[in-house]
Design a protein with these regions (language model features):
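Compositionally biased terminal segments of proteins
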Residues: 1-187
Length: 187
């Protein structure tokens, strides 16, 4: 298959749907979700698919090979695209909390399961909370500025992770960003 000049979103939809049609259930996570939910404000060149069952690694590899991807270390590469595909082992979780209800994007008959905007914000905040990653904080703010997110759910999750103070900082920055618009200042 020729993937030249395909967007990350289009490729993610195609790969995710192809895996699903081959019986390999996945959820797209990580930077690809940030890119999709921030409308490409933040670029990512990897598609991290969490397998719903660890035994799906081999069928997943075979499905990717059908599309022309080849295994290269832990990633899969295709000669027509700069995007890499990686399988992560289950469960789909953010910090210690499982992701129970992934979002779905449909395009025609294609279907992609991915982190919801709320879970995508939590995923980025986890890197900020635990490793002080400022880029991840900026990504969380970018996703929150462009999507309806459940701040109560994020607050509950942050509290369960012992990160009340950092959540308060995030919430203040998010409120400031709403005042200045989604392209407002960096954190």
């Amino acid at each position: 298959m020729n993937f030249k000049n395909w967007s990350l979103r289009r490729l993610a939809l195609t790969v995710g749907d192809h895996l699903r049609r081959r019986g390999v259930e996945t959820v797209l996570t990580g930077g690809a979700c940030v890119s999709i939910h921030s409308r490409n404000r933040f670029a990512s060149f990897d598609l991290d698919f969490v397998l719903m069952a660890a035994e799906d690694r081999r069928p997943g590899r075979l499905a990717l090979e059908e599309l022309g991807f080849r295994k290269d270390g832990r990633h899969f590469r295709h000669p027509d695209t700069p995007y890499l595909v990686e399988f992560l082992l289950p469960p789909v979780s953010i910090g210690s909390a499982p992701v129970l209800h992934p979002a779905e994007i449909r395009s025609g008959r294609r279907l992609l399961k991915l982190l919801s905007p709320t879970d995508c914000v939590k995923d980025r905040l986890a890197a900020y909370f635990f490793w002080n990653d400022r880029l991840s904080l900026a990504q969380a703010l970018g996703v929150a500025a462009r999507n309806a997110v459940d701040f109560r759910d994020i607050r509950r999750w942050a509290k369960s992770e012992g990160m009340d103070e950092k959540f308060i900082h995030f919430k203040k920055l998010a409120a400031d960003a709403r005042k200045t618009g989604p392209e407002g200042g960096a954190p």
